[in-house]
Amino acid sequence: MAADSREEKDGELNVLDDILTEVPEQDDELYNPESEQDKNEKKGSKRKSDRMESTDTKRQKPSVHSRQLVSKPLSSSVSNNKRIVSTKGKSATEYKNEEYQRSERNKRLDADRKIRLSSSASREPYKNQPEKTCVRKRDPERRAKSPTPDGSERIGLEVDRRASRSSQSSKEEVNSEEYGSDHETGSSGSSDEQGNNTENEEEGVEEDVEEDEEVEEDAEEDEEVDEDGEEEEEEEEEEEEEEEEEEEEYEQDERDQKEEGNDYDTRSEASDSGSESVSFTDGSVRSGSGTDGSDEKKKERKRARGISPIVFDRSGSSASESYAGSEKKHEKLSSSVRAVRKDQTSKLKYVLQDARFFLIKSNNHENVSLAKAKGVWSTLPVNEKKLNLAFRSARSVILIFSVRESGKFQGFARLSSESHHGGSPIHWVLPAGMSAKMLGGVFKIDWICRRELPFTKSAHLTNPWNEHKPVKIGRDGQEIELECGTQLCLLFPPDESIDLYQVIHKMRHKRRMHSQPRSRGRPSRREPVRDVGRRRPEDYDIHNSRKKPRIDYPPEFHQRPGYLKDPRYQEVDRRFSGVRRDVFLNGSYNDYVREFHNMGPPPPWQGMPPYPGMEQPPHHPYYQHHAPPPQAHPPYSGHHPVPHEARYRDKRVHDYDMRVDDFLRRTQAVVSGRRSRPRERDRERERDRPRDNRRDRERDRGRDRERERERLCDRDRDRGERGRYRR
C-alpha cells in the first residue's frame, strides 16, 4: 500500500512537470538529438519495462531544463530524480535501505548540479558579452548581410553545454540501467533461490557503493573540466579581443590606403562578410561530448578566428596578383612618361640657358587667349624698346604672362622676332581710356607652356632685381633675374602639346644669322623668318629697294687670289640718284621734284665696254638718253661668259634708275603743262583786254557826257523857276 501511494504521488508530480515543461521539452528535443537516440535505444531494449522508460524520460527533463528552472525547490528536483526500481521479492528493510542510499546519492548529484548551474549562469553573460561587442564593431553592411550571427553563436554555445550535460546524464542512466538490471535479475531469481537473497543484497550494496564512488569521481571530473573550460574560455576571450583589435587596426589601415591612393581595392565586402558568416556557421555547428568538447571548441574557434580579412588576402592570391600586375603596368607606364618628361625638361633647360626673363602683366584673360591663339603680343613703347634691345643681345628672351588679380601665371613664351609695324591690326581688348595707337609694334612669340601656375607654388621665389620681392609682384615689363626666372619656368607643369624642337631650331637659326658679318658697315637688321616666296607689301615698293636681299660676301672675299672684278661694272652709289640725301629721306615730293629738276639732264648713254674681239654696233640717235634694246649675244668666241648674277644685278639697278627717270620726266611734263595752260589763257586775255578797254572807255565817256548835259539842263530849269517865284 505504501508503495502504491508513493507511486501515485510520483505520477502526480510527473504530470505537473509535464504541464510546466511541455513547450520547452519540444524545443529541447529539437536541439538535442541525443535524447531521441537514447529513446530509440530504450525502446529497442526488451529488458526495460514501461515504468523504466517513463522514469528515464522524467530523468531527462529536469537534467535538460535545470538551467532554465534554477529557482525550483529542492524537493521537486529530488522527486524528479528518484529512480523507481521494482520491489518484487524484497523485504521492507531492504527496500528502505536502498531507498535511503538512493536519496543520499540524488542529494549529492543535485548539489553538484546546482554548483555547475550557478557557474554556468555566471559564465553565460560574460560569454555573450564579447560576442555582442564584436557584433557592434562590425560594419552595418556586414550586419545586414549576415543577420543572425548572434543567435547562431548562442545556439552553438547552448548546444555545447547541453552536449556536456547530456553526456553526464547518459553516464548516470547507464549506471542506473546496470543497477536496475541487477535488481531485476535479482528479483526474478528470488522466486527460485530465496536463500541467495542476502548475497544479492550484499552484492547490490557493494554495487551501489561502487556506483556512488563512480558518480562522485564523475562529478569531480566534471568540476575540473568546468574549471579548465572556464580558464580556457577566459583565455579565448582575451585572444578574441586581441584579434578584434588587430582586425580594427587592419581595417583602419585599409581605409587610410584607400583614401590616400586613387587605386581601388579589388577585395569586395562580400568576401569579408562571407568569411565572417563562415566563422559563425562553424561556431553554430560545433558540438562536443565529455572532456573533448572544450578542446574541440578551442580548436574550432581558433580556426574560425583565423579566417579574417588578412587570411582572405592570402587565400585570394589571384586578386592580389592581378592587382600587383596592374601596379607593375602602372609603374611601366609611369617610367615611359617619366622618360618623356625628362627629355622635355632637358630641352626646356636648353631653351632657358642664358636667357632674359620679363614679367608681362595683362589686364584681362582675352588678350592672353588671343596671344596664345595667334602667337603675337603688343606692349607699350617703353617695354617695346626694352624687349628689342634684349632680343638683339640675349640668346633667348622669355616672356612670363600673368593676368592681374588672377592669382596665377598663365604661361610663358619666347620672343621669335623684333617688333614690326604696318602689319594687319590686332584687335586687343583695351581698358577704358586707352587707344590702339598707344601700343607699340607687334612681337611674334613662340609659346613654350600654355598651362597655368598658381602663385602659391612660386611663393619661395624672390626677384633680386625687384628689391627681393616675391616673383609674382612686378609691373608690366619687369625683368626677372636669371636663376629666379629659370626656377619659375621649371615650376610650370609640362605642356606635351608644345614641340620644343621647333623653338630650338629657331634659336639656332637666329644664332647663325647673328654670327654672319655684314658688309659695307651697315647696321644689322633682323627680318622675321618667313616662308620662301612670301613677301610683305612694302618689299614691292620702289623706294624700299635696300630691303631686298643682296649677296653679301665676307671682307676677305675680294682679296683672295684669282679674283678679278668685272671691268664693266663700276660701283656707283645709286641710292639717291643725284638728289641730296636729306631731301631724299625727309623732303616732300615737291622738294624731290624740284631738286631733281635742277640736277640737269642725265649723261648720254654709254654702253659697257666690249670684250676683246667684239665689235660695238653704232648707237641710234634715239637711244642717246635711253638704254638700247637688248642685243643677241654672239656665239662663243673663246672668252669667258659674263656671270649671270653680275648681269642680273647691273641690269636690275640700271632698269630701276631708268624707270625713275622716266617717271620724273612724265610727272614734270604733266606739272609744267598744267601750269602753262592758265598762263597762256591769261596772256590771251591780256592781249584782248586793250581793245575791250578802249571800247569800254569810249562808252563810259559818252555816258558821262550825256549825264553832264542832263545835269546842266536841270540846273537851268531850277534857276528859271526860282526867278519866277521871287518876282
From Swiss-Prot:
Record keyword Nucleotide-binding present: no
Residue(s) carrying Phosphoserine: 35, 118, 120, 146, 308, 315, 317-318, 320, 424, 435, 545
The record's account of how the chain is modified after translation: Tyrosine phosphorylated.
Biased composition (Acidic residues): 199-254
GO biological process: one example: mRNA splicing, via spliceosome
Basic and acidic residues: bias regions: 1-12, 50-59, 91-115, 124-144, 151-163, 170-185, 255-270, 524-564, 679-727
One Pfam family here: YTH
Residues given in the record as RNA binding sites: 361-363, 377-378, 428, 476
Location of Phosphothreonine modifications: 148
Keyword field: Isopeptide bond, mRNA processing, mRNA splicing, Nucleus, Phosphoprotein, RNA-binding, Ubl conjugation
Reported impact of residue 377 to A: Abolishes binding to N6-methyladenosine (m6A)-containing RNAs. Abolishes binding to m6A-containing mRNAs
Domain YTH: 355-492
Compositional bias annotation for Polar residues: 63-90, 280-289
Cross-link Glycyl lysine isopeptide (Lys-Gly) (interchain with G-Cter in SUMO2), sequence positions: 96
Domain of life: Eukaryota
UniProt biased composition (Low complexity): 315-325
Cellular location(s): Nucleus; Nucleus speckle
Effect of residue 411 to I: Abolishes RNA-binding and ability to influence alternative splice site selection
Outcome, altering residue 387 to E: Does not affect ability to influence alternative splice site selection
GO cellular component, one term: plasma membrane
InterPro entries documented for this protein: YTH_domain, YTH_prot
Assembly description: Interacts with SRSF1. Interacts with SRSF2. Interacts with SRSF3. Interacts with SRSF7. Interacts with SRSF10. Interacts with CPSF6. Interacts with KHDRBS1/SAM68. Interacts with TRA2B. Interacts with KHDRBS3. Interacts with EMD. Interacts with RBMX. Interacts with ZCCHC8.
Its biological purpose: Regulator of alternative splicing that specifically recognizes and binds N6-methyladenosine (m6A)-containing RNAs. M6A is a modification present at internal sites of mRNAs and some non-coding RNAs and plays a role in the efficiency of mRNA splicing, processing and stability. Acts as a key regulator of exon-inclusion or exon-skipping during alternative splicing via interaction with mRNA splicing factors SRSF3 and SRSF10.
Protein known as: YTH domain-containing protein 1
Species this chain originates from: Homo sapiens
Gene name of the record: YTHDC1
